[in-house]
Amino acid sequence: MSLCGTRANAKMMAAYNGGTSAAAAGHHHHHHHHLPHLPPPHLHHHHHPQHHLHPGSAAAVHPVQQHTSSAAAAAAAAAAAAAMLNPGQQQPYFPSPAPGQAPGPAAAAPAQVQAAAAATVKAHHHQHSHHPQQQLDIEPDRPIGYGAFGVVWSVTDPRDGKRVALKKMPNVFQNLVSCKRVFRELKMLCFFKHDNVLSALDILQPPHIDYFEEIYVVTELMQSDLHKIIVSPQPLSSDHVKVFLYQILRGLKYLHSAGILHRDIKPGNLLVNSNCVLKICDFGLARVEELDESRHMTQEVVTQYYRAPEILMGSRHYSNAIDIWSVGCIFAELLGRRILFQAQSPIQQLDLITDLLGTPSLEAMRTACEGAKAHILRGPHKQPSLPVLYTLSSQATHEAVHLLCRMLVFDPSKRISAKDALAHPYLDEGRLRYHTCMCKCCFSTSTGRVYTSDFEPVTNPKFDDTFEKNLSSVRQVKEIIHQFILEQQKGNRVPLCINPQSAAFKSFISSTVAQPSEMPPSPLVWE
């Protein structure tokens, strides 16, 4: 995982400060100074189930059909699509392995035949279409992650041969709460348009509504995540830390501008590709900011080590400052290569925080519940010990610690915002590196680099969650989601569907969601 080299570029900084677009100085970056490579850790799986994604209406792929009229071709394609998802022929939506039977590798078969049959995702082909060439030497599909509410696989998109991630959202329609949560996440994934936030590239064709139980979302495939990188033995340069932190805050500024709280920012939810581009993922716990302070918000959020003090103290109302606290913990973890506040229980978590920050004022605890305040006031009065942050590593410079101390503030109303954190001088080099050789918003020409006019864009309008107010039954939400997915089908792209014959797919559908121990722990009940 390497970062390209870059020299401080006065024109870019001028562009940033003045907010105008500028072409960079005219030297070409032919000789990048590569930073130490951070290869993604390999996943050890006992079996690599054979390869899994099929493209939809072949009419869309081959508009020119010599032997049939376009109308007939469209009809044939529609028939093929219907057959693929025809409830009459498939009693269950997908055949699942027999109970208790581990899905084994596919039986040996000629490679080409096996590859084509094994692809998990396929297009809706009809007899006149031909398989894309790249189906012959495809990587096997394999599980790459288990989120709070779903399983993620790495698969090949048969339309272009690109590797993508396929996320299965299972058991969507168990109850109304689950339906609403999944619909919210799905709408968010389709709403996001930002390079540091994971978004939906596609949603697989749903079957007939009577057989509609799971949702499959296609996203970009990322090779690693910040957790794997932090625990790996590879050195992390200060350039890596700056460019990672810059991208986390850039994505968070966008999310917060949309009025969204992520509520589970942790290293494992920050995906990183081989070019060090970072994307925030897993919106299973995200929600729109609650501006009415009298409305209670759930406390079952944020993995304990990254949980802000106001949540630990039972506050019934919190803001997007909880995400900034999590980022501060991650910043310290990037510097020190270990978890900053690694406690065994939520109460100990709070005690470790006050060991560093000192005993909070009553004003800083104003939103806490009485039991939590009593716990703090019963204990000894602690002085802050913030200078200890300089011992995290040699990279914990004055600027780094200054920014870190603006994030790790007990009182959420005094914690720095993502927007203000991005203006901190510590991040100037990260911004420069990102926009000089990593981003998609700036581009290079023969005369140099042309920078975007807005380095850290926000979204307008905000994400609208009013759709949730009128959802009253599982069947109603199911119909709305089914319709929503059909409407999302991207223009003239061939729709994708699951190939239920694929061995990998059989393994995929039997794979389970995170065990309860991996879920964010339940909130502390203060006496």
From Swiss-Prot:
Disordered: annotated segments: 22-72, 90-139
GO molecular function, one term: ubiquitin protein ligase binding
Bias kind Low complexity: ranges: 103-119
Binding residue positions for ATP: 144-152, 167
Location, primary (coarse class): nucleus
Motif interval(s): TQE: 298-300
Ranges where the Protein kinase domain occurs: 138-427
Bias-annotated ranges (Basic residues): 26-54, 122-131
Post-translational modification (record): Phosphorylated on Thr-298. Intermolecular autophosphorylation on Thr-298 activates the enzyme.
Activity regulation (record text): Activated by the non-canonical Wnt signaling pathway, in which WNT5A leads to activation of MAP3K7/TAK1 and HIPK2, which subsequently phosphorylates and activates this protein. Activated by dimerization and subsequent intermolecular autophosphorylation on Thr-298. Other cytokines such as IL6 may also activate this regulatory circuit.
Positions bearing Phosphoserine: 522
Tissue specificity of this protein: Expressed at high levels in the brain, and at lower levels in heart, kidney, lung and liver.
Cofactors that this protein relies on: Mg(2+)
Catalytic activity, as annotated: L-seryl-[protein] + ATP = O-phospho-L-seryl-[protein] + ADP + H(+); L-threonyl-[protein] + ATP = O-phospho-L-threonyl-[protein] + ADP + H(+)
Protein origin, superkingdom: Eukaryota
Modified residues (Phosphothreonine): 298
Domain remark text: Contains a TQE activation loop motif in which autophosphorylation of the threonine residue (Thr-298) is sufficient for kinase activation. This mode of activation contrasts with that of classical MAP kinases, which contain a TXY activation loop motif in which phosphorylation of both the threonine and tyrosine residues is required for kinase activation.
Function recorded in the entry: Serine/threonine-protein kinase that regulates a number of transcription factors with key roles in cell fate determination. Positive effector of the non-canonical Wnt signaling pathway, acting downstream of WNT5A, MAP3K7/TAK1 and HIPK2. Negative regulator of the canonical Wnt/beta-catenin signaling pathway. Binds to and phosphorylates TCF7L2/TCF4 and LEF1, promoting the dissociation of the TCF7L2/LEF1/beta-catenin complex from DNA, as well as the ubiquitination and subsequent proteolysis of LEF1.
Subunit structure: Homodimer. Homodimerization is required for intermolecular autophosphorylation, kinase activation and nuclear localization. Interacts with RNF138/NARF. Interacts with FOXO1 and FOXO3. Interacts with the upstream activating kinases HIPK2 and MAP3K7/TAK1. Interaction with MAP3K7/TAK1 seems to be indirect, and may be mediated by other proteins such as STAT3, TAB1 and TAB2. Interacts with and phosphorylates a number of transcription factors including FOXO4, LEF1, MYB, MYBL1, MYBL2, NOTCH1 and TCF7L2/TCF4.
Protein name in UniProt: Serine/threonine-protein kinase NLK
Annotated organism of origin: Mus musculus (Mouse)
